[in-house]
C-alpha cells in the first residue's frame, strides 16, 4: 500500500478524518515513491478526509507563493512598493532563471520579480525577493506570525531543493501549507487588492501545464504553483474549482520516488483527475 495524505479544511474550521486507501483507489500508473501525499482543502465543507497530513515534505518552489505573500504584506504595510526597481548583476544569477537573465541591464520591479517567481518559477527572482524581506528566516518568521509554526524556509535557491531524507530544512506539512495558503488567498492578512494579485499570479502559472491543469474539464478555474526537487521530489499547491471560480485548495507533494519527471507529472495529473471525478 502506498501512503496518501489528504486534508479537507472548511473556511472557518479544520476537520480531519484519517483513513488508509488501497492504491487502486487512485488510478496511478508507473508509481513507486516512498512517500506521496494529497492535501485537499474544501471551503464548501462537504467532504472531510485526510491521509496522514502531518508529515514533512520539501516545499521546493511552492514556497514562492508564500514568499510573494510576504512581499505583498510589506506592500500593504507601506514597507515596500511593487513598482520599485531592483538592479542585480551576473553574479546574482543562479540555476534556472529564464526571466531575470534577460534583464541584467535594466533590472526588474518587485511586481515583475513576483510574477517571474510564480509564473516561471525563476530562482534568481525568488532570491532577490527573499533579500527584500530579510532572507529565509524572515519568511519563516512571517509564517509564524500567521500562525503557521510548521512551515520553514532555511536556505536559498537552488540549495533548498536538496530534499534530504529526514532533513526538516525547507519543509512543510500538507495541513499547514493548505491552511496558510487559504489564509493568504481568503483571509484578512492581505488587502483585497493584494489577495487578488497573488491569485492572479498563480492563475498565470506557465510551468505547471502537465500537472493538475492537464486534468481540468472545460470551464474550471485553477491558480497553482508547482515545485521540483532532488531525490524524486515533486509538488503542487492550487486553488481550483468548477464554473470558473476556486472552491477548494489542493496540495500534493511526493518525495523519494524513482519515477522520471514525466512519470511524476502523470501521477499528479491522475490524482487530480480522481479528485475532480469525486468532487
Language-model features, listed with the residues they occupy:
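Short, conserved catalytic-motif segment at the N-terminal edge
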Residues: 34-57, 80
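Short, glycine/proline-biased beta-turn/loop segments that scaffold the active-site neighborhood
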Residues: 77-102
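Mid-domain, small-residue-enriched loop/turn segments at the edges of structured enzyme/sensor domains
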Residues: 127-186
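Conserved catalytic neighborhood of penicillin-recognizing serine enzymes
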Residues: 93-128, 136
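Short amphipathic, helix-prone segments within low-complexity/disordered or flexible regions
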Residues: 3-8, 14
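Structured C-terminal helix/loop/strand segments within mature extracytoplasmic catalytic/sensor domains
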Residues: 22-30, 47-48, 55, 131-132, ...
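Flexible glycine/proline-enriched surface loops and loop-helix/loop-strand junctions
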Residues: 50-53, 109-112, 120-125, 157-165, ...
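Active-site SXXK
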Residues: 57-86, 250
